[in-house]
């Protein structure tokens, strides 16, 4: 029975990985520029996105596996859950976590930078004339990658050794053996804890800036983007109007052929107006082609069809996401206040909370649903995808910046390969920030013990197992502060919570920054949410030719019935003959 249960948990994780592969592919193909698509960049971005999402979605697997060793209804360990069995489960999870974190680090520090420099090294003219070989590109990318890696490792070593060097100097033990002991201590787990804490802290800063803003903008953007005229109809109407426009231009030019004075004032004004209208129609034609997925990958075309199906639900979905965002906001605020007020050790250990003292809605929902796997897995998957989507929206809105300088812009169908790689690295770091936030703030009880309980009944001897079958009121949720010795035998904390607690205890600075950053996240969300409700974003004048579709789509809006008809046309790919505008235009120029 135990083997079946654990196998089903891992099967659910495998199914989630397959879903994540589709999501990662949609994200990459939807945002990258089709004309500049490079196979190496596409594969690296998809695989890196898949790895980072797989890392954060290991949390419910972690919770389900450690919780499967106990009976929450009785607060006892199951008969098969011997210490060796439990240790085996924990050890397996540790190996998977180390593998995924190492893979994320390998991708961010070596693979993605190498791919970035490989793409930058390409010289089209030199390649056409045979002056640049693949070996030269590889060597150039390799040199820059090594330089980047040396820079990162140097920062890591300085950050890791300087505090301990000061401590060793104070203790008059400044020798090489002391530093060897630091690296060998707990098989290097302290060094790994520092590396994880450093990356998690950097990721949390990005999480505050990008995800905090994106979580506020995502629902509002869905609400404000009302259903518009279908892409097939837009293409048909535009083609008809463009043909009529050019025919009228030919008539004007033909009428004035051979005339000495050229066009008269009235015809000249009309021709200039037609030329301006032609440019607008050409932009609109390009918009229709891009929106319908013309010349795009089949994944993008499929996604456009799916969007068309759910387009009528955008308003409802946006309102629902606002409710979800506000519940997350309230849950994080409650946990933050609880930790600040009731932490067992305060800033000395990163504000670890022994047990929840204030009712927290999101944590309660996940704990209750975790009793019936995989309900909690589905809810957690949706929660992670919401954070991920919010991060993407935040990056797409703000762009990739250094201080006030915009280095890259992230736009659907217009993102360069270099920008895609940079965005992927940012998302990887942000997911590490999401890891901390979900496990320690959003749902701390769920991410630590899940639905595990223990029997708080006194026994005559240490070896005797307490029985609460007749005392249900003594069955209590597992907690780090439980004083009953039986709690230590029954309660098994998740591997991730152990990792994070190890980081915050060994390196309190990381714990303080990670904790107070959650309040900064809430502040950014609140400011952007209120601002977004009352202020419409301005269009970048430098990208009018590319972004004009928003104004044009709004100008083509019609009745509600027409909007739902547009949805059906997008699904089928067929359009009606006219919408009236074409008829009037044809009649005007006939």
Swiss-Prot record:
GO terms for molecular function: cobalamin binding. The chain crosses the membrane at residues 9-29, 41-61, 95-115, 145-165, 191-211, 315-335, 347-367, 378-398, 422-442, 509-529. It is found in: Lysosome membrane. Keywords: Cobalamin, Cobalt, Glycoprotein, Lysosome, Membrane, Transmembrane, Transmembrane helix, Transport. Its main location: membrane. Glycans are attached at residue 565. GO terms for cellular component: vacuolar membrane. One of its GO terms (biological process) is protein localization to vacuole. It holds the Pfam family LMBR1. It is a multi-pass membrane protein. Probable lysosomal cobalamin transporter. Required to export cobalamin from lysosomes allowing its conversion to cofactors. Belongs to the LIMR family. LMBRD1 subfamily. This is Probable lysosomal cobalamin transporter.
């Amino acid at each position: 029975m135990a083997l079946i249960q654990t196998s089903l948990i891992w099967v659910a994780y495998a199914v989630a990985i397959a879903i994540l592969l589709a999501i990662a592919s949609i994200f990459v193909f939807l945002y990258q520029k089709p004309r500049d698509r490079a196979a190496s960049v596409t594969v690296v971005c998809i695989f890196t996105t898949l790895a980072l999402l797989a890392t954060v979605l290991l949390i419910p697997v972690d919770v389900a596996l450690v919780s499967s060793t106990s009976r929450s209804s009785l607060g006892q360990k199951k008969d098969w859950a011997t210490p060796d069995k439990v240790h085996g489960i924990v050890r397996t999870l540790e190996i998977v976590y180390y593998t995924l974190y190492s893979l994320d680090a390998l991708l961010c520090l070596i693979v993605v930078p190498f791919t970035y420099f490989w793409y930058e090294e390409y010289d089209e003219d030199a390649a056409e004339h045979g002056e640049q070989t693949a070996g030269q590109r590889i060597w150039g990318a390799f040199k820059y990658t090594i330089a980047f890696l040396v820079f990162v490792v140097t920062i890591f070593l300085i950050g890791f050794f300087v505090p301990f060097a000061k401590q060793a100097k104070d203790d008059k033990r400044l020798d090489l053996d002391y530093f060897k002991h630091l690296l060998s201590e707990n098989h290097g787990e302290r060094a790994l804890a520092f590396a994880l804490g450093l990356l998690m802290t950097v990721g949390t800063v990005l999480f505050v800036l990008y995800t905090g803003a994106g979580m506020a903008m995502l629902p509002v953007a869905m609400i404000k983007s009302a259903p518009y005229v279908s892409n097939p109809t837009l293409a048909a109407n535009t083609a008809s109007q463009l043909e009529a426009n050019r025919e009228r231009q030919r008539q004007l030019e033909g009428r004035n052929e051979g005339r000495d004075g050229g066009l008269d004032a009235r015809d000249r004004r009309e021709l200039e107006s037609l030329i301006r209208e032609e440019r607008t129609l050409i932009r609109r034609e390009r918009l229709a082609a891009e929106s319908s997925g013309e010349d795009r990958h089949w994944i993008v075309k499929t996604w456009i069809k799916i969007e068309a199906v759910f387009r009528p639900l955008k308003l409802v979905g946006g309102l629902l996401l606002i409710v979800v965002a506000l519940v997350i906001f309230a849950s994080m605020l409650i946990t933050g206040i609880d930790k600040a007020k009731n932490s067992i050790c305060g800033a000395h250990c990163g504000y670890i909370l022994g047990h929840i003292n204030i009712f927290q809605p999101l944590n309660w929902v996940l704990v209750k649903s975790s009793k019936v796997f995989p309900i909690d897995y589905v809810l957690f998957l949706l929660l992670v995808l919401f954070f991920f989507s919010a991060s993407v929206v935040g990056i797409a809105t703000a762009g990739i910046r250094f201080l006030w300088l915009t280095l890259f812009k992230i736009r659907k169908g217009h993102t360069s390969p270099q920008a895609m790689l940079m965005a992927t690295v940012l998302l990887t770091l942000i997911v590490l920030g999401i890891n901390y936030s979900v496990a320690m703030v959003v749902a701390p009880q769920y991410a630590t013990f899940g639905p595990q309980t223990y029997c708080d009944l006194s026994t005559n001897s240490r070896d005797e197992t307490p029985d609460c079958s007749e005392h249900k009121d003594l069955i209590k949720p597992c907690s780090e502060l439980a004083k009953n010795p039986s709690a230590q035998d029954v309660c098994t904390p998740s591997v991730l919570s152990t990792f994070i607690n190890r980081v915050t205890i060994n390196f309190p600075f990381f714990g303080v920054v990670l904790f107070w950053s959650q309040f900064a996240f809430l502040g950014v969300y609140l400011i952007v949410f209120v601002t977004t409700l009352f202020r419409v974003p301005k269009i970048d004048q430098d990208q009018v030719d590319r972004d004009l579709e928003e104004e044009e789509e709004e100008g083509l809006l019609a009745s509600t019935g027409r909007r739902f008809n547009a949805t059906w046309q997008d699904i089928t790919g067929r359009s009606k003959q006219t919408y009236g505008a074409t008829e009037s235009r044809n009649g005007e120029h006939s």
